């Protein structure tokens, strides 16, 4: 599938992708800190949570904007919505990894 994204939504999609990338990068930094400097893990995990929340907000706003477009066909709206959901799920999975990592940090510190 190749979703045709309307020009007026390009900035919102770009903002969503940037937040998701920031969440994943914070998760990677958190994982690296687990092996090098365990005290720094918590700071990176907070950043993962922050970026995931931001991506959720942008995702919700974008989905609302998609369904407010009267000139798009329903099938196109559904395709764009699914695309937004899949991109947002990447940030959700990064947060899941960070949550599991926090459990390992607690176990390691005992």
What are the language-model segments listed below?
Residues 1-110:
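Cytosolic, long alpha-helical scaffolding segments
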């Amino acid at each position: 599938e190749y979703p045709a994204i309307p020009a007026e939504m390009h900035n919102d999609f770009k903002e969503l992708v940037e937040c998701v990338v920031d969440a994943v990068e914070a998760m990677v930094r958190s994982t690296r800190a687990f092996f090098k400097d365990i005290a720094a893990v918590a700071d990176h995990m907070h950043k993962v949570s922050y970026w995931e929340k931001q991506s959720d907000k942008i995702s919700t706003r974008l989905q609302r904007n998609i369904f407010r477009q009267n000139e798009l066909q329903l099938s196109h709206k559904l395709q764009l919505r699914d695309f937004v959901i899949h991109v947002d799920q990447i940030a959700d999975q990064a947060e899941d990894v960070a949550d599991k990592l926090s459990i390992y940090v607690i176990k390691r510190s005992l």
